[in-house]
Amino acid sequence: MLDLKFLRQNPEAVAAGLARRRFPFDLDAFLALEERRRACITAAEQKKSQRNAASAEVAKAKRAGGDASAALAGLGALSDEIKALDEDAKAIDAEVAALLLGVPNLPHATTPDGASEADNPEVRRWGQPREFTEFAPREHQDVGAALGLDAERAVKLSGARFAVLRGALARLERALAAFMLDLHTGSHGYVEVVTPYIVTDECLVGTGQLPKFAEDLFKLEGRAAYLIPTAEVPVTNLHRGEVLPESALPLGYTCHTQCFRSEAGSYGKDTKGLIRLHQFGKVELVRFVHPDTSYDELEKLTNQAEAVLQALELPYRVVALCAGDIGFSSAKTYDLEVWLPAQGKYREISSCSNFEDFQARRADIRFKPDGGKKTAYVHTLNGSGLAVGRTMAAILENGVQADGSVVLPRALVPYMGGLEVLEPEGKRA
């Protein structure tokens, strides 16, 4: 949520920032609400002054032994008017708060200008895409079908956009998650947490998915609760309503969960394979940091996600999302895009974002500076470290051999019990 005080003091600057991200903020409507609110407050203050004067007159009349009934009646009427004005002001405050819940974060000054993903500048690349000289690149779903990716049974169980993994691919899914968690806890200093897959609507308001993106979520019938779209939601909300000591910052958590998304608006996109599913595994990185260091922390977080791709020997690039493409809660985002040979392009595998104090205001997450100073909001960051299914897809496409086998990255061999090559199921038999 935006800082209401900053918005009231700098409405034109806020409108300009929101215009960068193509958000149609109705500045006139907000200013009209503010004018109504100020009018209520001013009128209430005037009535309170009148009530104080009337109270003094009543007291004076009583001391003199006179009749104070008329003054008392007027005093009661003033109190009723003040109560009504205060209620009007509270109603306007609630209207402003509801309006702010639907307003996205302001893009950081270093977030590039642009309208869509076509305007996202490339920051850097790592690795050299493999040249296929003996055979054409193969789609990961075709490679996976011979290794244990069962699309037909997934449809039978759950419908479209689900996956069943069997045998070596099921083990690879488990190995990837374990490898990522070990890297982030062992080398990057994260604390691993295990959280529920069901959260309250309050959690989703805190991280910014609600109220604006309800159609993207799976809601539990009869409850104000949802399946998580990402571990960002429960992990960020671990400290909702808390005040952290400054000495605890930066604080980092990593979490492997299944994620659930309706994929509303993605009809016809990536209908096969592991790229866009209703349920998918992901290892998440969440950081609570001091506001003064949050952009250094964003670079660090991005490098930590990159370390997974480098260890898995997967070519990738980093792009900076433009103002028109960043997520609702983000001030600045880097996307990591892994090379998929069969598609002949880089595809998103991680987003690393700095939300500044946007989520912290919504979820009321503060820290107390050393020395007993006034509390302040933390800055929150998160990134995928990585999406497990998309990582598997990249391994299948980049490691496939002419006979349909797949050479595994060296870093995964210990997690696969020494297995270096995935063989097609028929060949293994």
From Swiss-Prot:
EC class name: ligase
Gene Ontology terms: biological process: selenocysteine biosynthetic process; seryl-tRNA aminoacylation
Pathway annotation from the record: Aminoacyl-tRNA biosynthesis; selenocysteinyl-tRNA(Sec) biosynthesis; L-seryl-tRNA(Sec) from L-serine and tRNA(Sec): step 1/1
Cellular localization per UniProt: Cytoplasm
UniProt-listed InterPro entries: aa-tRNA-synt_IIb, aa-tRNA-synth_II, aa-tRNA-synth_II/BPL/LPL, Ser-tRNA-ligase_type_1, Ser-tRNA-synth_1_N, SerRS_1_N_sf, SerRS_core, tRNA-bd_arm
Cysteine-cysteine disulfides: none
Family matches, as Pfam families: Seryl_tRNA_N, tRNA-synt_2b
Gene Ontology CC entries for this record: cytoplasm
Entry binding sites for L-serine: T230, A231, E232, E284, S384
UniProt domain comment: Consists of two distinct domains, a catalytic core and a N-terminal extension that is involved in tRNA binding.
Assembly with partners or alone: Homodimer. The tRNA molecule binds across the dimer.
Protein family: Belongs to the class-II aminoacyl-tRNA synthetase family. Type-1 seryl-tRNA synthetase subfamily.
Record function comment: Catalyzes the attachment of serine to tRNA(Ser). Is also able to aminoacylate tRNA(Sec) with serine, to form the misacylated tRNA L-seryl-tRNA(Sec), which will be further converted into selenocysteinyl-tRNA(Sec).
Identification of the protein by name: Serine--tRNA ligase
Origin species: Solidesulfovibrio magneticus (strain ATCC 700980 / DSM 13731 / RS-1)
Gene: serS
